[in-house]
Amino acid sequence: MWRGGRLGSRGVRLLETLGFGCPSAVAQPPRLTSRSAYSGTQLTRNLQIKPWELGEHGTMCFRSYRMALSCLSRVKTYRTPWKRLYSTSQTTVDSREVKNFQALAHTWWDEYGKFAPLHSMNDLRVPFIRDNLLKTSASHHPGKPLSGMKILDVGCGGGLLTEPLGRLGASVVGIDPVAENIKIAQHHKSFDPVLDKRIQYKVCSLEEAVDESAECFDAVVASEVVEHVSHLEMFIQCCYQVLKPGGSLFITTVNKTQLSYALGIVFAEQIAGIVPKGTHTWEKFVSPEKLESILEPNGLSVETVAGLVYNPFSGYWHWSENTSLNYAAHAVRSRAQEHQEPAESALKGETGALHANTSGSPSVREEQRT
C-alpha cells in the first residue's frame, strides 16, 4: 500500500498517528464495528493527541478531523427526535405479526394446509354470528337471513369468514393490514359475481377505518384477531366507534391458561404442526374475564361466552362449557343514552341530589308557595 514515495516519511508517520494503518504491519482480518462503537474508541484515542506533537500540517489535519466529527454528532442529535416521534405513535397492528402472515398469505384457501383449523371453525362461528344477529333483527329474509346488514370483518386475512357472511346476504367490508392477504381475498371473491358485489376489501388497520366509518356497521367480527394485536383496549374502543348503537361485536380467541400454552403453542405449533410456528404469543392471550373487564367500561355489554374445542384427529370443532382453550364472545354496544361518561353520570347524580335537598328545605318550600 503506502510507501515512502510521494508522501515521504513524515506523511507516513502522520497517517500512522491518526490510525490509518502501518504499511509494515501484518494485515489483520477486518472487524465489524458499529459507527458508535468506533467513535467511542478509535476516534477518541486519536483526538487525545496533542496538536503540538503533529507539527503544522498535522495540526491542520487534526482540526479538520475534529470538525468532521463534530458535524457527525450534530446530525445524530437532529435525527433523534424524529426517531422518538415515530416510535411512540400507537397502533393496534403488530409489525411482527404482519411479517408472519405475509409469509403465509398464499396458503389461505388450502383447506388442508396451514389454515385448515380456520376453515373448519366456520362450521361453528358462522351460525354463532348469524343466530345472534337474528335475535336483534326485526326482518328475516328466507335464504338471505343477513340481508340489509353491514358487517366489518377485522383482520379478514384471505376472506375465509368474509365470504360465508356475504353468502348469507350481508354487505361485508373486510380489512387487513397485510396487502398480500387482501390480494388473495380479492382474487378469490372474483370467481363469484354475487360475492364480488357484496364484499369490499381494504388494506388498512382498524383505527384507520374509524375515521371514515364511525357508527356505520351492524356488526364487527374479530375472529382469531385479538391475540395478535397490540394495545387491546385501543382495539376495543375502535370496535365501539365503528358500531351502530345496539350493534354486535363478535370475538373468537384463545384463553390465557397453562393448558392453552401446552396445547395451543407447544403441541399445536412445535409438535403436531397444526399451526405454523410463531403464530401465537402466549403473553397476548386474553382470558374471558380480562376481555369482559375491557369491554364493559367501553360501552360493550357481554351477552354470551362459549367454549370452543378443536379435535386435531378429526379436524372438527365443537362447542363446550369449558373455556380454558378457545372461546367465542358476543357483546352488544349500548344505546347512546345508556352509555354515559362517568363524569357526566356523576354530575347528573350530584345535580339531582342538590335539587332534592334544596326543594326539601323549609325556606324553599315557603318560596314555592308564594
Curated annotation (Swiss-Prot):
Q: Is Magnesium included in the keywords of this UniProt record?
A: yes
In alphabetical order, the GO MF annotations are: 3-demethylubiquinol 3-O-methyltransferase activity; 3-demethylubiquinone 3-O-methyltransferase activity; polyprenyldihydroxybenzoate methyltransferase activity
Annotated CDD domains:
AdoMet_MTases
An example GO CC term for this entry is: mitochondrial inner membrane
Pathway(s) served:
Cofactor biosynthesis; ubiquinone biosynthesis
This entry's Enzyme Commission designation comes to 2.1.1.64, 2.1.1.-, 2.1.1.114
| Cellular compartments annotated | Mitochondrion inner membrane
Query: Which catalysed reactions does the entry list for this protein?
Result: 3,4-dihydroxy-5-(all-trans-decaprenyl)benzoate + S-adenosyl-L-methionine = 4-hydroxy-3-methoxy-5-(all-trans-decaprenyl)benzoate + S-adenosyl-L-homocysteine + H(+); a 3-demethylubiquinone + S-adenosyl-L-methionine = a ubiquinone + S-adenosyl-L-homocysteine; 3-demethylubiquinol-10 + S-adenosyl-L-methionine = ubiquinol-10 + S-adenosyl-L-homocysteine + H(+)
Instruction: Report residues binding S-adenosyl-L-methionine.
Output: 125, 155, 176, 223
How does it sit in the bilayer?
Answer: Peripheral membrane protein
Q: Where does the transit peptide start and end? A: 1-86
Q: Its principal location?
A: mitochondrion
Q: Which cofactor does it need?
A: Mg(2+)
Q: Name one GO biological process term.
A: methylation
Binding of Mg(2+), residues: 224, 227-228
How it assembles, according to the record, is: Component of a multi-subunit COQ enzyme complex, composed of at least COQ3, COQ4, COQ5, COQ6, COQ7 and COQ9.
What family is reported? Belongs to the class I-like SAM-binding methyltransferase superfamily. UbiG/COQ3 family.
Record's protein name: Ubiquinone biosynthesis O-methyltransferase, mitochondrial
Q: Which organism is it from?
A: Mus musculus (Mouse)
